[in-house]
Swiss-Prot record:
Signal peptide range in chain numbering: 1-18
Family (UniProt): Belongs to the MlaA family.
Gene Ontology cellular-component annotations: membrane
GO BP annotation list: intermembrane phospholipid transfer
Protein name: Uncharacterized protein RC0123
Lineage, broadest ranks: Bacteria, Pseudomonadati, Pseudomonadota, Alphaproteobacteria, Rickettsiales
Record's keyword terms, sorted: Signal
Highest taxon, organism lineage: Bacteria
Amino acid sequence: MRILIILSIILCSLSIRADLEYVDNEIYNYNGGSNENGCVEVYDPYEKFNRKVFVFNSVLDYIILRPLAVGYKNITNDYVKARVNSFVSNVDTPLTAINYGLQLNYDKTMKSVWRFLINTTLGIGGLFDVAGKVGLPSDRQTFGSTLAHYGVAPGPYLVLPIIGSTNARDMTDSVITNYALNPLMYYTHNDFDLGVLAVSKINDRYVVLPFSDYVMKNSTDPYVAIRSALHRVREASVQYPENFKCPKPKN
């Protein structure tokens, strides 16, 4: 049983989840950043390699992860899904506080800390978003956001096996934020804990199920559609320095 749960956790970290969860999270946790001085065009010098990895990851997702997400959709009600979403959002909050601290934004750092404390206590471990009802809405920041805050451009677009779509700057999020510093990755003392982690990852995939299904069924080039969506939403969600200008890609 424990081995099966661990396997499901690994599989729930596949590329389409990583790609589309990222888009979804950035859309619904948009922090007011502007893309007026951002990088409009995607720099994809490794497109040939990226496309091959995209196909590989997409096949694994279709065979393994998507069926899990569809099953989760069918056997859970809206109330359960809302509790899981709230719990996962609460787990992300300390990382948001850390990144606002690195950006020297004291006000938002403290708001993130208070949001986490309120939801962890009054919200019963984050199952309920009490803080949001008292003026402390969800606000997601990552290490990639912090690098952008200090003027780091996105760099080359990359699609990595298992990890999924990212760019040179936001690889810190793919590896550090989502895995190394994700508290859920260490909250696995028994089968129940592993089950909680597995459900949270399956929920991540479920959240973007409508978007992923639409792209895969209707887009003439799903690779370009997902690449464009990721880049556009990400650039709109980060806040560059006032005088930042996106560097022109080297030929």
